[in-house]
């Protein structure tokens, strides 16, 4: 085995270990609620079917997406894979009731749901 091959092997093992460390730590939960664009919801409380077009445009533009449950609790969403936003999973469901399963992490009063699946 050459030195270069050994170096690449060690690098791959370290990279794999670091990816494992990047997984969010928390319980797996299922949340039912409405998919909202956080800008409009936080600024003016806008949500529901009448807000679907605006919510979709805002989310497409890059605004964060959240889930608001029946109690009014807000879950900010993020993608679980490759540190991507959850936009691809939720964009077509803006202003609709969804069931989201993922890893819940709470820090400083903020609830972040790392999304695994959306129904």
Regions found by a protein language model. Give the residues of each.
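Bacterial N-terminal signal peptides
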Residues: 9-20
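Positively charged n-region of N-terminal signal peptides that target proteins for export
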Residues: 1-7
């Amino acid at each position: 085995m050459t030195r270069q091959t050994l170096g690449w092997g060690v690098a791959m093992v370290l990279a794999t270990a670091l990816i494992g460390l990047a997984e969010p730590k928390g319980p797996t939960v299922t949340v039912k609620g409405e998919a909202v664009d956080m800008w409009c919801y936080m600024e003016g409380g806008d949500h529901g079917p009448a807000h679907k077009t605006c919510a979709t445009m805002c989310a497409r533009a890059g605004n964060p997406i959240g889930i608001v449950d029946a109690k009014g609790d807000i879950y900010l969403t993020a993608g679980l894979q490759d540190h991507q936003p959850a936009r691809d999973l939720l964009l077509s469901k803006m202003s609709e009731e969804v069931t989201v399963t993922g890893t819940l992490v709470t820090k400083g009063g903020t609830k972040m749901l790392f999304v695994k699946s959306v129904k």
